[in-house]
Regions:
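Interfacial/capping segments of alpha-helical transmembrane domains
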Residues: 71-90, 251-260
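Transmembrane alpha-helix boundary signature
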Residues: 70-75, 109-116, 174-178, 250
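Membrane-spanning helices that line or support transport/gating and their immediate boundary helices
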Residues: 71, 75-83, 293-308, 386, ...
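Intrinsically disordered, low-complexity segments enriched in Gly and acidic/Ser/Thr residues
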Residues: 287-288, 301-307, 314-319
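Alpha-helical membrane segments and immediately flanking helix-loop junctions
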Residues: 87-167, 312-366
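Short amphipathic alpha-helical coupling elements at transmembrane boundaries
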Residues: 43-54, 81-86, 229, 300-311
Length: 410
């Protein structure tokens, strides 16, 4: 049994715990039947529900872009392919640079890879779980949640995170190379040359983004927000066209990928968008409860880590929450000290969703890449903490307001 299978078994163990809690909650709660053990698992049933209900949000983000992937590859290929080949990189790296793996990056990378499966995995699941999500999801979402005064710390944190993405990708690529990734029984050949050469365009983009965040942070962040709005519009067009094609047979956009199984698809080998989303939700049934319970059971050690980093408890809790989803962390930012805000924003660039949506996506689409993806994301998360700590102005590490601390513990 490989490490990827072990991870899946662990998540399914937590899924069963959460299922038991959800059942017992109908009859008075787990604590009533299981005592202290029941009290320690209470609430996991709610996370079980959250995991399955994520299907709707995932569908809105994924289906349209998945359907559009071959169309976009056809339109962008004449520009992207020669440009990336000139740099010595595979064109699929374009997809993971701008799109999250679960927002079309994985499928667009496949279309642009030209049959190079290793480059597709490298871009679609490793790079596409770090840089792409930051640009199209994390920054726009954060701007709608955080206080305007915290935008500066968001920019500083993202700056630190973007700079360390190449390190994260190389770490994930090396794990993939040495762990012997196989897909449908065929080995996927990751090489040093592939891992390093494909970082050239990523480093160029990372440097440009970092310079922009350093010298014109407001304009850069607003630019990401505008890009995200156009992306939502594009995804909606793709979704509407794909649904009309499925229900009425009208091909409004030629070349759309089917969103349900099509004639000739082999069950278990070809997964279309709707089936992928269902598979991700099944994984999240265990992933969300796992994060909740591990956070609860190991609260004291986690708080000690926060003390070592010299951040308050709310900031330490935000880092743990980020491993599943960074939206709760952004909501907690106003209750963090300045150092904690920068570290959390930096940490979320690589580490966000490592035990949540991205884990579910990798498990549903290419479970051989679960371990390399998680290692890459966590290496990035750890590495970026040091960079973020260097970037925080020592004279501006303002503690969170006292009333916010009180609210946090009430």
């Amino acid at each position: 049994m490989g490490i990827n299978e072990i991870i899946m078994y662990i998540m399914m163990f937590f899924m069963l715990i959460a299922a038991v809690d959800r059942i017992l909650s109908q009859f008075g709660g787990s604590a009533r039947f299981l005592g202290k053990l029941g009290k320690s698992i209470e609430g996991s049933g709610g996370q079980f529900e959250e995991g399955f209900m994520a299907m709707g949000a995932l569908g809105l983000a994924m289906v349209g872009m998945t359907a559009l992937a071959p169309v976009l590859a056809h339109l962008l290929g004449p520009v992207i392919i020669p440009l990336y080949e000139m740099l010595g990189a595979n064109p699929s790296m374009f997809a993971g640079t701008l799109l999250a793996c679960d927002m079309g990056g994985f499928f667009l990378a496949k279309e642009l890879a030209g049959g190079d499966v290793a480059a597709w995995m490298y871009s679609g699941l490793i790079l596409g779980s770090m840089m792409g999500p930051t640009i199209v999801f994390s920054i726009p979402v954060a701007l709608g949640i955080i206080e305007p005064t915290d935008r500066r710390w968001l920019a500083l944190g993202v700056l630190a995170g973007i700079v360390t993405i190449p390190i994260s990708c190389i770490a994930g690529g090396l794990v993939a190379m040495y762990s012997g990734v196989e897909i449908n029984g065929q080995p996927v050949e990751f090489t040093f040359a592939l891992i390093l050469m494909n970082m050239i365009p990523v480093i160029i983009v990372a440097v440009l983004v970092a310079l922009g965040l350093k010298f014109i942070p407001e304009k850069m962040i607003n630019g990401f927000q505008i890009f995200a709005k156009f992306l939502v519009a594009l995804i909606t067009i793709g979704l509407a066209a794909a649904v009309i094609k499925f229900l009425l047979g009208w091909e409004l956009i030629p070349g759309l990928d089917p969103i349900f199984m099509a004639p000739g698809d082999q069950p278990g080998e070809v997964m279309r968008a709707i089936e992928v989303i269902g598979s991700i939700s099944c994984v999240l049934l265990g992933a969300y409860p796992m994060v909740l319970l591990l956070t609860r059971w190991f609260e004291k050690p986690l708080m000690r880590v926060g003390n070592l980093l010299k951040i308050n408890n709310m900031a330490a809790g935000g880092m743990v929450a980020t491993l599943a989803n960074n939206i709760p962390m952004f909501g907690m930012m106003k209750q963090m000290d300045t150092r904690g805000k920068v570290i959390n924003c930096a940490f979320s660039v690589s580490a966000a969703f490592a035990l949540g949506d991205h884990l579910g996506f990798a498990a549903a689409n290419m479970n051989a890449m679960i371990f390399p993806m998680i290692v890459g994301k966590l290496v990035g998360g750890v590495t970026v903490i040091g960079v973020a700590m260097l970037l925080v102005p020592k004279d501006e590490n303002v503690p969170a307001p006292a009333n916010n601390e009180a609210e946090a513990h009430s």
